[in-house]
């Protein structure tokens, strides 16, 4: 990593295992991997790291609670814990070494297929805008910002991160009629959907949550 990051001023760190898995399986990619990125940034005098964090760093809060960037961590599993760790790692490297960091707490960056995603959706266009703002903003210091579109039902607030200049354009409400026309029995039966972390919050530690997620990896109709 040190060789790959020579003579760069900014690193976008989006690499990770993106599921709930046993801790030892998570350790290399999500914990040590993040340390390696920031240590390489320090050794190579890199000015900033843009990090793909996750809603799962605060996934155990009830969905009725509005979350802000300054909301304390409440991880919903080992995956969420790895995001908490890296946000704290980023804070330490900023305080000790002056490396700026923008931690993007990405919510649901996939097609809207559930009632929960009406609150948490981040469109691809808004994701691109968010990353570009994290890159182009002149001075970020250490910042946390939620990756979420301008959804009518959202209770993720970026009131503490206005300096990033992220102004999402899309709104999941355009999918609401279709979602409520579907059978929601299975979704509503999952206690995790009462929490910001969704199925990750109700899945046992170390057990995959992706099987419970109604994610459709298709751009048809977009």
Language model features with spans:
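Conserved C-terminal active-site "lid" loop/helix of NAD(P)H-dependent oxidoreductases
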Residues: 150-167, 179-217
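Alpha-helical substrate-binding/gating segment
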Residues: 95, 105-111, 121-143, 150
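A recurrent short beta-strand within the Rossmann-like NAD(P)-dependent oxidoreductase core
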Residues: 116, 140-149, 157-159
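NAD(P)H-binding glycine-rich loop region in Rossmannoid oxidoreductase-like domains
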Residues: 1-29
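Glycine-rich NAD(P)-binding loop of the Rossmann-fold in SDR/ketoreductase-type enzymes
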Residues: 10, 25-36, 44, 73, ...
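Catalytic helix-loop patch of NAD(P)-dependent Rossmann-fold dehydrogenases
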Residues: 28, 62-101
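SDR active-site strand-loop-helix element
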Residues: 11-15, 49-55, 104-106
């Amino acid at each position: 990593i040190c060789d790959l990051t020579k003579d760069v001023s900014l690193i976008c760190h989006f690499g990770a295992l993106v599921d709930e898995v046993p801790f030892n399986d998570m350790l290399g990619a999500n914990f040590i991997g993040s340390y390696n990125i920031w240590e390489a940034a320090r050794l190579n005098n890199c000015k900033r790291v843009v990090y793909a964090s996750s809603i799962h760093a605060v996934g155990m809060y009830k969905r009725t609670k509005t979350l802000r960037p300054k909301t304390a961590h409440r991880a919903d599993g080992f995956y969420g814990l790895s995001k908490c760790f890296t946000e704290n790692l980023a804070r330490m490297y900023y305080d000790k070494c002056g490396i700026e960091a923008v931690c993007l707490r990405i919510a649901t960056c996939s097609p809207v297929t559930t009632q929960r995603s009406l609150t948490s959706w981040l469109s691809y266009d808004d994701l691109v805008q968010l990353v570009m703002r994290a890159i182009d903003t002149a001075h970020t210091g250490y910042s946390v910002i939620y990756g979420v579109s301008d959804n009518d039902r959202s209770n993720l607030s970026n009131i503490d991160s206005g300096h990033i200049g992220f102004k999402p354009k899309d709104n999941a409400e355009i999918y609401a009629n279709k979602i409520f026309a579907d059978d929601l029995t299975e979704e509503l039966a999952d206690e995790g959907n009462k929490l910001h972390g969704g199925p990750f919050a109700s899945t046992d530690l170390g057990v995959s949550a992706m099987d419970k997620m109604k994610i459709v990896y298709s751009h048809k109709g977009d």
